[in-house]
Every structure is written in C-alpha cells, then in structure tokens.
C-alpha cells in the first residue's frame, strides 16, 4: 500500500535522480558516527509513521522523510568523494589508460565505440559510480570524457590523407561511415571531409 502511495508522489519522479542506487557493494557509503546517527534518526521517523494510524498526513510525512534520508545519503556520498582524493585520482588515471588502450586496439572494430559500462567493468566499478566520480572531480561525466577522447583521436586521423573517412570511422567503432560523419559534425560543426579540406587549405 505504501509502495503504491510513494509511486504517486513527487518522490517517485525524484528517486531516479539518486544515482547511488546503482552503485555496487564495494562502493558502499562509509559513514562517520555523526552521519550514522543522522541516518538512523531519519529511519526511525519513517518507522514511526509506518506504525502510526493512517491519516491525511501519513503519505506526505513518509515520502518527505524518505526524501530527507536520500538527500542525506547524497550529501554523505559527496563528502566521501571529496575525502578520497588520492583514490579518485588513481581511478581517473586508470580510466584514461583504459580508454587509450581500447582506442589503440582493434576492439572498436569488433565491439564498437567505447562505453561507460566497458570502462567501469575494467575498473571494477559500477557505471554510475564512475560517472559520478568523474563529474565530481572534473565537472564532466564519463560519457563526455569518452566523447572528447574519441573526438581528439578522430581529428588527428582525419588529417591523415592516406586513410579514407570510412576507414577512420570503422577504426573508431562506428558501424557506418554516415554515423561517424553525423557524430563528427555534431561535435565539430563540419563534416570530416570538410574538416580535412579546411586543414589542407
């Protein structure tokens, strides 16, 4: 019953924004004693409302307290990201190396363009945790990091006139040259051929 009530509240819309629900067990939240007491206090309030006879305030009080609990969890995860700076920098370096290795290999031809999930798996992290960590450290999501890395490489290879645009597109993991051209134009503002011609001019 309460599950149905929550589903029909604003909380149901907000809850998908809490990306930590997709974190894996090794990315669990490590609470200080004060943080632990805050979480327990929130849970006790929710429990009290669940045990209280239902009235017109029940629904809003339960959902408001759940949202408060989730907001505290988000705050404490932000703190955890900030206090693990050395670990985070190591993950960033390994993420960059994973991307470099992937794009320098033949994997794009067989597996396609690199994905956040692929990189996260290689780093033994969940995709959401990796993306959140990168966003906290650099201001840019994992997907945007991948896109920028691919664009830098694409620009370099487009200037190599010994390769056709089709060859370059396959090397980067695009199944069709048209897909690569559309992506390149979206990122740069001109097609690969136009970019190559502008350089030669």
Each language-model region and where it sits:
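…primarily DNA-binding HTH/wHTH and HhH modules…
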Residues: 181-201
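A hydrophobic/aromatic-rich effector-binding and dimerization subdomain
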Residues: 3-52
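DNA-binding alpha-helical recognition surfaces that contact promoter or target DNA
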Residues: 97, 132, 144, 156, ...
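An amphipathic alpha-helical interaction segment
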Residues: 37, 41-86, 90-97
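A short, Lys/Arg-enriched amphipathic alpha-helix from helix-turn-helix/homeodomain DNA-binding modules
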Residues: 85-125, 144-163
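Append "Primarily bacterial transcriptional regulators
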Residues: 118-125, 130, 134, 168-175, ...
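Terminal helix-turn-helix DNA-binding modules in bacterial transcription factors
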Residues: 137-175, 197-201
């Amino acid at each position: 019953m309460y599950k149905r009530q929550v589903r029909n509240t604003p909380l149901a819309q907000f809850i998908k924004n809490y990306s930590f629900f997709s974190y894996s067990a090794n990315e669990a939240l490590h609470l200080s004693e004060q943080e632990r007491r805050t979480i327990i206090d929130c849970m006790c309030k929710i429990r009290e409302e669940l045990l209280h006879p239902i009235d017109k305030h029940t629904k809003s009080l339960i959902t408001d307290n759940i949202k408060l609990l989730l907001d505290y969890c988000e705050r404490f995860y932000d703190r955890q990201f900030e206090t693990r700076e050395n670990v985070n920098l190591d993950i960033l370096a390994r993420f960059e190396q994973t991307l470099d290795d992937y794009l320098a290999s033949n994997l794009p031809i067989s597996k396609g363009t690199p994905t956040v999930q692929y990189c996260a798996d290689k780093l033994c992290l969940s995709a959401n945790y990796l993306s959140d960590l990168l966003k906290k450290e650099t201001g840019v999501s994992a997907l945007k990091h991948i896109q920028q890395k691919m664009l830098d490489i694409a620009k370099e290879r487009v200037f190599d006139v010994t390769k056709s645009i089709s060859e370059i597109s396959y090397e980067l993991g695009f199944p069709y040259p048209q897909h690569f051209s559309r992506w390149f134009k979206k990122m740069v503002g001109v097609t690969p051929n136009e970019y190559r011609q502008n350089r030669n001019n």
